[in-house]
Amino acid sequence: MNTKMNERWRTPMKLKYLSCTILAPLAIGVFSATAADNNSAIYFNTSQPINDLQGSLAAEVKFAQSQILPAHPKEGDSQPHLTSLRKSLLLVRPVKADDKTPVQVEARDDNNKILGTLTLYPPSSLPDTIYHLDGVPEGGIDFTPHNGTKKIINTVAEVNKLSDASGSSIHSHLTNNALVEIHTANGRWVRDIYLPQGPDLEGKMVRFVSSAGYSSTVFYGDRKVTLSVGNTLLFKYVNGQWFRSGELENNRITYAQHIWSAELPAHWIVPGLNLVIKQGNLSGRLNDIKIGAPGELLLHTIDIGMLTTPRDRFDFAKDKEAHREYFQTIPVSRMIVNNYAPLHLKEVMLPTGELLTDMDPGNGGWHSGTMRQRIGKELVSHGIDNANYGLNSTAGLGENSHPYVVAQLAAHNSRGNYANGIQVHGGSGGGGIVTLDSTLGNEFSHEVGHNYGLGHYVDGFKGSVHRSAENNNSTWGWDGDKKRFIPNFYPSQTNEKSCLNNQCQEPFDGHKFGFDAMAGGSPFSAANRFTMYTPNSSAIIQRFFENKAVFDSRSSTGFSKWNADTQEMEPYEHTIDRAEQITASVNELSESKMAELMAEYAVVKVHMWNGNWTRNIYIPTASADNRGSILTINHEAGYNSYLFINGDEKVVSQGYKKSFVSDGQFWKERDVVDTREARKPEQFGVPVTTLVGYYDPEGTLSSYIYPAMYGAYGFTYSDDSQNLSDNDCQLQVDTKEGQLRFRLANHRANNTVMNKFHINVPTESQPTQATLVCNNKILDTKSLTPAPEGLTYTVNGQALPAKENEGCIVSVNSGKRYCLPVGQRSGYSLPDWIVGQEVYVDSGAKAKVLLSDWDNLSYNRIGEFVGNVNPADMKKVKAWNGQYLDFSKPRSMRVVYK
C-alpha cells in the first residue's frame, strides 16, 4: 500500500564527535524527534593515569596487541603481557596532560643499541573504535524521504521474502517508494533480514516495527542488529551505506583522553626492549617491559561426511578474513591455518573391525555418535596431528596417544548417517581436537579455548565478565590491521547489567558489557566475528602458548621452545617411544614366561605396588637370544621382592627403579633406560598427503586404509626403510621416487581392537598406492588419487622463515614478504607493492640477499645480507662501491648462494 507521509526524522552529526537524536515512537508511522546537540566525546577510561616511567616525565604506558595491556598491571589483576615479534600500539598518557607538545619514543635493545625513534600521534588522532562509522556527512543525516510515499509490508508472503541475502524484495519496493515499513509479528516472521545495496538507493529509508516474540537479525552492509519484540529500527541509505538511527552515537566513544600513540614494529618487540619517552624537556624511561614467547597456533581444517556427503558449511575454513579476525583475539605472533580437502567416507571401518557401508546402527547427535568420536575426533583429527608429529601408529581407541607438544589443532566439521538419520556433530574441543557445527562465532572461540586449557566460567565473575575501566579484568581489544579498538561492550544501548553468580557489572553509557568466550559470550559486532577473551582468560591462553614448542626449520632439532629463564626460543627435542614393550603380570614372572616376553618385546617392565605384588622375579640367563633386551623394575610395594638374575639373588625394596640390559653374557644394571627417540621433520610446511586407517598386528580383524587426505601445509619425516625387517608391521607407499616404508607397532596397543596409523608423505612425491603389511603378509591395499588443486593455507602475523635456498624481504608495515630462490632477481625494480617500503631481510641457510637502493642493481650500489637483518642494521651498510648506504628501503634485489 502507498500512502503519503508527513514524517521527519533528523540526526545532526559530525565525523568524529556528533550530535545525537532521541527517537520515541508515538504510534505506527509517527515519530517525534528531540535533537540534543552534544559534540563531546564519551571516554571509557577516565581513571587518573599512574606513572610507569623513571625520570622527569611522568606518564602511564599501555600497549595494544590482541588487546590493550598495561605496562604494570594492578595488584591482583591477571593480564597478559607483550608477545614477542608482534607489532604493538604504544599508548602514552602523561600524568600532567599536554596535548600540544610533541612526544617521541626512542627504542633500545638489551645492549642499549638504538632500534629507532618514532614521533607519536597526538591525542586527537587516537584510533577509533570498530563502532565508529566513516562516511557520515558533516551536516548530519536527515531522515526525511525524498518523496512522500511508503510501502508497508505486513503479510506473511511478503515477510517471508525478506530472508533473501540480496535484499531484492526490499530493493524492488524502494524503487518507487521513499520508505519501506516492515511489520513483523507472531506467525509473520523470519530469522534473518537483509537490506539491499546499490547507488539507486541513495536517500531511501527502511523502518522495522516488531511485534514478534522471536527476534530477527537485520544485516546491513558489514553490520547487523537484533530486532526484538516492541522495538522499532530506522535506517537510511547515505553515501553508499545504510545508517541506523541511534548507532551514530557510538562515533563519540573513545578509549581515553590525552593519549599519544604510535605503532611499534614487530621486530622491536623482543625481551630487553626499553623505551625512552620524551615530551619537550621532559624524559622518562620504561625499562622493565615484560615480553613473552612468540607463540604460534597451527590450525588444520577439514570437512568430513561419514556415510553421507560433507556438509560444506565450514565457513571459517573458506574465509581468509575470518582467519585474520581470530588472530586478532589471541596473544600469538603467528597463526597458520591449513586447509584440507573435504573428506567423503562412503564406508567407515571402526577399530573393532566392523565395516559400516550404509549407516551407523547406533544413534548420533550433536554431542554423540560412534563415528563422531572414533572417526572424526580420534582417527581424522588426531591422525592429522600425529602425522605431523612423526608418530606413525597409536592405540585404536581413545585420545591418550596424542603428545600435544605443539599448539597444533585439527578442527573439523562432521556429520554422519545414523539409525536416527543424518546428524551434524559439534560442540567439543580439547587435546588438539576441535569439533564444530558453527565455525563463525562463539562456538569456535569456545571450543578452541578448551584446547588452551580453559574450562567453563573461568574464575567466575571476576574472570569471566568484561569490566569497566576502574576494575580488574578490564581491557579493549585491538585490531592491528584495521587500526581500530574493539570495546568490551556491545554497540547497542540496552541499559542491561552483566551478571554472574549474583554479581553484576553495570553498563557503560547504556552499553552491556560482554562475557568471556567460555562463559556464554558472543562477538560484539560483525567487525570481528569471534568472542573477545577477557584479560584473565588471555593470560591463561598466553601461558599455554609459552609452554608449547613450535615447528622450526632453523632449529637443530626441528622444534623450538621458549625458555622463560633465558627469555629465548631454544632447540627443543620432540621424542616418541617406538620401542615394543609390555608390562608383565605379577602372576607370570617365571623364567620361561619372561623369556617368552623378551623374545617378542624389546622392553619388559615389572611394576609392583601394594595390592599388585609377588615375592620372586625370575629372569632368564643372558644369551645371544636376548642380547639388547631391556628389563625395567619399578618396585613401589611395601613388601620386598627377590630378583633372580645373573645366577644371583637380589633384594628389591620399595623405591627401587632400575633397568637391566642384556649384552648376551650378563644383565647389566643401569639407570632406567629411556627408549624414546627424537623426531625431526624432513620437510617443513609442504603440501602433504595424510594416510590414516586401522591395522591388526594379529591379523584377525580386517585392516583398512582410508581414502587419502590432502592438506596444503604439513610436516613429513624420513621413512624407516633402513631399520625395518620383513616381519615388522609397516605401511608401504609407492611414489614417483620409489617405495617408502614406515614402521608401525608390531603389537596391539589395546587388546581387543586394531591400532590406528597416521603418516604424512609429501604430495610432491605423487603417491599412488598404500599397502599395509605385517609379518610379511599384505593386510590391505589402497590406490591413491592425485591431490586436488587449489588447496591453500594462510599466515597471519609474523611471516614464515625463508626456505633453505630462498631469500626474502619483509615489509615492516604490512608483514608481507617478497621472496626469490637462489639465482633469481627482481627484474628492473621490486614489485610496486613493496618497492620503497621499509623492510627487513630473511634469508635461508644457503642464500644471500643482494639489495640496491637503485633500480636494476645499478652502479654497484649493492649491499649483501645474510640471515635475519633488521632495518636498523640496514641503514648504514658498506656497498660494493665503497660507500655506506641505506638499504632499508630497497628498489631492486637478487638472491645468490651464500
Curated annotation (Swiss-Prot):
Induction: Up-regulated by the LEE (locus of enterocyte effacement)-encoded regulator ler. GO terms for molecular function: metal ion binding; metalloendopeptidase activity. The keyword Signal applies. One of its GO terms (biological process) is proteolysis. Pfam families: Crystall_4, Peptidase_M66, StcE_b-sandwich, TagA. Residues 1-35 form the signal peptide. Its EC number is 3.4.24.-. Optimum temperature is 37-42 degrees Celsius. Active from 4 to 55 degrees Celsius. Inactive above 60 degrees Celsius. GO terms for cellular component: extracellular region. It is an enzyme of class 3 (hydrolase). The keyword Hydrolase applies. Its cofactor is Zn(2+). Residues 296-551 form the Peptidase M66 domain. Binds 1 zinc ion per subunit. Does not contain structural calcium, which is often associated with other metalloproteases. Inhibited by divalent cation chelators such as BPS and EDTA. Keywords: Hydrolase, Metal-binding, Metalloprotease, Plasmid, Protease, Secreted, Signal, Virulence, Zinc. It is found in: Secreted. Its main location: secreted. Zn(2+) binds at H446, H450, H456. Virulence factor that contributes to intimate adherence of enterohemorrhagic E.coli (EHEC) O157:H7 to host cells. Is able to cleave the secreted human mucin 7 (MUC7) and the glycoprotein 340 (DMBT1/GP340). Also cleaves human C1 inhibitor (SERPING1), a regulator of multiple inflammatory pathways, and binds and localizes it to bacterial and host cell surfaces, protecting them from complement-mediated lysis. This is Metalloprotease StcE. It comes from Escherichia coli O157:H7. The lineage of its organism: Bacteria, Pseudomonadati, Pseudomonadota, Gammaproteobacteria, Enterobacterales.
